[in-house]
Amino acid sequence: MTGLNETDARILVTSRHLFLWPLAETYFKNAEKVLQDCGVCDSFGRLLSTGLQCLYSVLMDTKMEPRVELLTRKRICEVLLSHTVEYADVEAILNRALIIAEQHNLTEYKFSLQLLLSRVFCRTSPKAAKVLLTRCVREAEEYAKVAEIYHSNNQSNPHRWVYEFLLATLEFQNVSQVANSIHNYANHHKHQHLQLLAMILNQSLPMDEISTDSDQISILCLVTQIAQCLRKGEILLAREILPKIHSKLESETFVWPSSYIDFFIDDTSKISIKWMSINQLYLLIYLISGFCYISDSTSGRASRFLQEGLRITGDFKHQERCVLEYLESQKWINNITKDMKYYLIATYLSRSRLSKAERILQSTEDDQTGFLGILKGMYLQKRGDLKKAEVHYRETAKNFSFRTDTFIISTLNLINILEDSAAASRCLESIEPLCNKHEKKIFKLWLLVLKVIREGPQVHQSNVLPRVIQQSSEYANTQLQYISLTELSERFGKLEHAEKMAISALELAKKSKDELWCLISGRILEDFYRSVQKYDKMRQQALENSAYSKLIEDIYSFV
């Protein structure tokens, strides 16, 4: 057997990475498959550890080229950051790689390493991350300017690093500030996809249809437009967009290759943004679709969308390829399942399906948002247990850690049931500024109705209620329509309009199949017929009311 000469031996040793790099990637690929199929388990850990050992073996080669060492260290750090929290090890490995990049003037490699280092600092030292990324943005901008002047033949567009670093600052900087920085830079350099990304981040998309060749970007734009509508309470406009999303999802040509969405700077360079997998997307669309119909109790769509969403959460399959993303995905699925349950409870309560709402309430764990406290209060209020409902509303309203929306809703509900008129008036005064300046105009309408109810049955105030009825219809809020119609009917007394308002409320309740509001509006109509001595209609309505009363006497304690 012929031995190797000195030159051959040197080539064999220094080429160690040519064998070990692909071998390591094979182990990593198999580890990812195990993660997707079985989650975090022993076999996953063994495969990951063996792959890392392959890369560490490359670093033991004393004669390897600097670029080989740099790339090996970079890959080790990518794997560690994806699957572990070994931040100290990653920082040490990266610092050595950065020295190599500086020594050999490998600027783009240096940028990629700094991006990884910023991820470490965001977890260990946010202040250091801010200092690092601020400097990196400035250096990347200077690098891009020089590259443009000298027409450098880079593999990637030099502007890419500016965007990468700006996006990394989202860890500690306001989204609006980052979006504005991206938009200004993209606008100056005419990067249309990145301008679009900035508008998505800032939730400032126009309501027109966005033309794009990417199914992923198209869906993301539609979801963002719906989010913009919901933020302002423009429910009907959000519903107009929903069919476009469902149509795209059902299309045979629909493509969703991964959790990452590509925004192109030019024909070859792109920024990949992590959003969600196709399985997560379907759940999100079911949640949004259900939410768009919650306020309209005349439609059963909200419960159908939310029930279907909850059904498929049981069959959810993770598609993440790293442990930290897998854990984030698990947290996400838990949160969206909880949100679906909450909104389904709200849907059942809006249609007076108390037994269904109660079953879900009993199986739902509390959270830190205060929403469950409001739902419990609403349930007790529907049951007629106003004292206990008041306790839930007060506890939720006085917790300053909750969102403004939560505070407003709990306070409005509290005002609605308070027996102490002076306390109710004080609550109205305190919450009025918040309702008036809030983006969701529906809060202002609720405030107006409660003020009118609390200020007494003067006829001259009734002109507020017709306006509320019209606007509540535009916002597709059935509960607000019920209250406004019945209150207005009682204010009209013996006038013909009183009958019309009560009949409208009753028809709305029948369409919603809401026995409680059928009974409430039916009793108002019965009292009206009695007051104007229409005894035949009164007796007919009394029989109908008796039937509704029997339907719900096991549920409502005050009937």
Swiss-Prot record:
Function: Involved in sister chromatid cohesion. Forms a complex with mis4, which is required for the association of the cohesin complex with chromosomes.
Organism: Schizosaccharomyces pombe (strain 972 / ATCC 24843)
GO terms under cellular component: chromatin; cytosol; nucleus; Scc2-Scc4 cohesin loading complex; SMC loading complex
Keywords on record: Cell cycle, Cell division, Chromosome partition, Mitosis, Nucleus
Subcellular locations according to the entry: Nucleus
Nucleus among keywords: yes
Name under which the protein is recorded: MAU2 chromatid cohesion factor homolog
PANTHER family in UniProt: MAU2 CHROMATID COHESION FACTOR HOMOLOG
GO biological process: cell division; chromatin looping; chromosome segregation; maintenance of mitotic sister chromatid cohesion; mitotic sister chromatid cohesion
Subunit structure: Interacts with mis4 and rad21.
Domain of life: Eukaryota
